Regions:
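Catalytic center-proximal scaffold of phosphoryl-transfer enzymes
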Residues: 1-203
């Protein structure tokens, strides 16, 4: 994460999957990828149908996305007070419901220290602690619902390893990532990949 020097100097909005290491960058405004949350919530809903809050939370996230998409179609860059209040209230209600369904395990005298949480409770606490980053996409319309584009950018790395087997050296892997990052950024900004590489070489 430190290798290319991007995140340490970054001052914008970074969307991620809530991996703990990302929160070590206090100067970044964080946004949580809702596609990752939907996958986790769907897993809980399918494997633990008694967890009624999970399916309700899926519905909430999708409704938030739907309402935002409609607002964007109408040329707006914000939601109505009604919708902000509705989503905020429903979010808190579902967190409360989830906590009631998944209370913290009691500690015993033999086991001291931090209480161990299961995957379900860990997700509940994440949703509670990072409510603002989760909901940022409806407050700032420049923030997407998910970071699927970033994940698509990474698929070429997987294709490369499948075709070539692996990178021979760590330095070679770093060079490959730098080149792909440069080409990907150029493409997003509307530049031809060939011209971008030629300009980088010729200065």
């Amino acid at each position: 994460m430190e290798q290319c020097g991007v995140l340490p100097e970054f001052k914008g909005i970074a969307m991620h999957d809530c991996w703990a290491s990302y929160w070590n960058y206090p100067d970044i405004q964080h946004a949580v990828c809702c596609a990752h949350l939907l996958r986790e919530l769907t897993g809980i809903d399918e494997n633990h149908p008694e967890q009624k809050w999970a399916s309700a939370f899926i519905d909430l996230l999708l409704e938030m996305k739907k309402v935002k998409d409609k607002a964007v179609e109408k040329g707006k860059d914000f939601l109505s007070y009604y919708h902000y209040h509705k989503f905020d209230k429903k979010y808190d209600e579902l967190i409360e419901q989830a906590r009631k369904e998944n209370p913290l395990p009691e500690t015993t005298e033999k086991k001291r220290g931090r209480k161990k949480k299961g995957k379900i409770l860990a997700l509940v606490e994440r949703l509670a602690n990072y409510k603002v980053p989760v909901c940022l996409f409806i407050h700032n319309f420049n923030v997407p619902f998910d970071n699927n584009q970033a994940e698509r950018d990474l698929r070429m790395i997987k294709v490369k390893t499948k075709v070539s087997g692996c990178f021979r050296t760590e330095e070679g892997a770093r060079d490959y990532l730098k080149i792909m990052s440069y080409v990907g950024t150029a493409h997003k900004q509307g530049y031809n990949a060939y011209e971008a590489i030629k300009n980088a070489i010729t200065g």
